[in-house]
Amino acid sequence: VNSSAPERRRQLLRISLQAVVADLSGGSHTAADLPGGAWLVDGATLWVRLDDAPHRALGAAIAIALREEVDRVEVLVGDPDPAPLVARRASQWSLPISVRGLDGRSPFPVEPVGHRAPPTVPDSHLDLVETIVAAGAEPVVAHGVLTAQYRGLEIAKVVDDDGAPRLDVGVGVNDREAFRELHAGEAPEASLARVVEAVSAHRVDGARPHPFNTMSPEGYLAWRLRDDPSALGVGSLVTTPGAVAPVGAVDPGPVMMLGGGRLFACTTGFDLGALPDALDAREVAVVAGVIDDASLTVVVPARNRLPVIDRMASAAAAEVRVVEVP
């Protein structure tokens, strides 16, 4: 039976990790899968091979390290580009974590990369803010990009089209391509208003499951808390960008918020990459001086407060509080 391409990739990662560890420490080990990579334990050391979005997959590695009660973590990253970011995030934990790149089967040291100032949004793009507001959506600027959101879900993005700004409407890449074909020639404001109307029926408390409310649940939680910040004991909340741009418009990731001189991270409770994202954002906020309290508050729905969240929070180098909301 032919295995699928993803399974073949997972198998290659397991074999790669086993070979590297055998070269370095001798002996034979059997690696297992983790989201975005592979892992094995050699004595008191967890070895991890990260592949897909390694800066977020680091969270799964840390969760396994805490479960296995190892003394240290050795992280191997095959792609040299994200490896310095992984090294920076590894330094934000009290658990000793070493990050190395891979040249074939040979590991090499990786230096952490510093935080970079985000690019600015072109003025021509900002001219579309009024269009976004008029359609009933919320304009959001992050990482040099202007997007339109509705109750925490990104429903459009401003892009360059032959040097001119254009509102690319839809939820995710595939939806935007289909929307362009179906509604070619329609005014951007009308297109966006059409999406707002479609999403609004589903993005409400108690609605039956639908892609419009199962995507970006963190965004919806953050929107609810901004609408009523009293649950967090602050007078107001505003969203703030994460330390790095998200992998995709509807991919998991915490929504960061500022309020009362504190930094909050809204997450579902199931996303193991949320804490590495949030701790990286905390570092940016501390350096920028935008918070008075250097701790991080992780906000999760009460029904989703899994023990792993608290274990990971206690393993962070900074103080991390976990709070529940209804």
Q: Which residues does each predicted region cover?
A:
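Charged, terminal alpha-helix-loop-beta segments
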Residues: V1-P326
